[in-house]
Amino acid sequence: MGCSAKARWAAGALGVAGLLCAVLGAVMIVMVPSLIKQQVLKNVRIDPSSLSFNMWKEIPIPFYLSVYFFDVMNPSEILKGEKPQVRERGPYVYREFRHKSNITFNNNDTVSFLEYRTFQFQPSKSHGSESDYIVMPNILVLGAAVMMENKPMTLKLIMTLAFTTLGERAFMNRTVGEIMWGYKDPLVNLINKYFPGMFPFKDKFGLFAELNNSDSGLFTVFTGVQNISRIHLVDKWNGLSKVDFWHSDQCNMINGTSGQMWPPFMTPESSLEFYSPEACRSMKLMYKESGVFEGIPTYRFVAPKTLFANGSIYPPNEGFCPCLESGIQNVSTCRFSAPLFLSHPHFLNADPVLAEAVTGLHPNQEAHSLFLDIHPVTGIPMNCSVKLQLSLYMKSVAGIGQTGKIEPVVLPLLWFAESGAMEGETLHTFYTQLVLMPKVMHYAQYVLLALGCVLLLVPVICQIRSQVGAGQRAARADSHSLACWGKGASDRTLWPTAAWSPPPAAVLRLCRSGSGHCWGLRSTLASFACRVATTLPVLEGLGPSLGGGTGS
């Protein structure tokens, strides 16, 4: 059966709604990606009106500095030339707070700022307290000894006398707090008196004393307002477009960002570059794999094995030399000339002889490799852990008695992990606005398009059913007409061939008495035959009168 008038009206309304849904879905497919991109570009740039500005200014991600010390177990034996033996202690965990100040927007699409850091010890997250004692090399003594190796013997003997007078030894037993944030040492005052400007320390010497309650230098970075492709990239550091610590222009270049955010819309072909003031160099991390952090898609970037390779293994690093074994970087040129080396913890990815020279080292790829998980659409870190180790090169130096018979060795002092992960309300807001809503819009556009297509089929189906129903009724009428006709004409002939001959009596009876059957038939042939059959007798009766009227 066909659709009623009411059904056809409803089908038409659904068709209109379907057309609107299909058009809206198609428009969304074309426009939504562009709109999302525009919103991301608008809100990741460094501008007070952008949504990410406060996140950039006051980083809401809780950062933690976890420090592991290498406690020297056999200092006396080392002085006799035996192999060092160490035991890892820690972690000693500090909550790191960061905030930017002196924010100045410049006319060349850049912004300058100082970022200050403060650290607070976290006993609940630590394995030990800041009052724990650690035996470790005396950097001031052993570092100075290596620095004096090629000096005149007289000067070295004077240095030995000074060490003895001040009570300085090759190894010291200090608390975690003293090693981290500084301890008073008469040798520091002596060095500052006779070698002013050599040390960045005034009264105390500590490995992290420079970092607490201080800034990491004046950064000038691009805002991305005028050119989004340069957003967060460092223009200058402390007014310099390149440093002068190293021996090649490539190694002295300041590349990448300040290490907090990166340009948006990353791909697996992207690399992660940043300038590290602590390492005095730029570093490049490479894409490893895609992942998910708390429902948010991420790209994981890791350090290539060539990061700390020496020049013989990786020629571009030749500018960081003089080098020892591959896998450690000499940072003496930016660390008051002390023979300090930077590497991955436990000499991971370094020449195996380095770890074999010290008992107690166990490099592990999972535990000691650094990584950054970045949201590729915005360039914002979701989860990161930067792990580095600081070591001291020490050896016996003729003329300086405190060095004894120490065999040349790169002895680890400590390694640290600077980690942070987005959490809490910040994570929820980020997920809702940058993951959930785009995902809903992505699926909604296809749902609308599919729904529109389905609704558009309703009036089409209704029209098809109406046409099929009409055809079926016509077919039934034709069949019924032939049946009626056959009852009044046993010879199955519809009409004599002679023009205007009288119709058979059976036809007249059928057509006059069968109004319920024949008059209502829709068959063109049957209807025409019935009408002619009933009309001809009338015309025949009127013929003589019409003819007489004419004759008169």
From Swiss-Prot:
Keywords: Cell membrane, Disulfide bond, Glycoprotein, Host cell receptor for virus entry, Host-virus interaction, Lipoprotein, Membrane, Palmitate, Phosphoprotein, Receptor, Transmembrane, Transmembrane helix
Record-linked InterPro entries: CD36/SCARB1/SNMP1, CD36_fam
Subcellular location, principal: membrane
Transmembrane region(s): 12-32, 444-464
GO CC terms, sorted: caveola; cell surface; endocytic vesicle membrane; extracellular exosome; intracellular membrane-bounded organelle; lysosomal membrane; lysosome; plasma membrane
Pfam families in the cross-refs: CD36
Highest taxon in the source lineage: Eukaryota
Glycosylation sites noted in the Swiss-Prot or TrEMBL record: 102, 108, 173, 212, 227, 255, 310, 330, 383
PTM field: N-glycosylated. The six cysteines of the extracellular domain are all involved in intramolecular disulfide bonds.
Compartments (UniProt record): Cell membrane; Membrane, Caveola
Tissue specificity of this protein: Widely expressed.
GO MF term (any one): high-density lipoprotein particle binding
Keyword Disulfide bond carried by entry: yes
Quaternary structure, from the entry: The C-terminal region binds to PDZK1.
General function of this protein: Receptor for different ligands such as phospholipids, cholesterol ester, lipoproteins, phosphatidylserine and apoptotic cells. Receptor for HDL, mediating selective uptake of cholesteryl ether and HDL-dependent cholesterol efflux. Also facilitates the flux of free and esterified cholesterol between the cell surface and apoB-containing lipoproteins and modified lipoproteins, although less efficiently than HDL. May be involved in the phagocytosis of apoptotic cells, via its phosphatidylserine binding activity. (Microbial infection) Acts as a receptor for hepatitis C virus in hepatocytes and appears to facilitate its cell entry. Binding between SCARB1 and the hepatitis C virus glycoprotein E2 is independent of the genotype of the viral isolate.
Family statement: Belongs to the CD36 family.
Protein name per its UniProtKB record: Scavenger receptor class B member 1
Lineage of the species this protein comes from: Eukaryota, Metazoa, Chordata, Craniata, Vertebrata
Gene: SCARB1
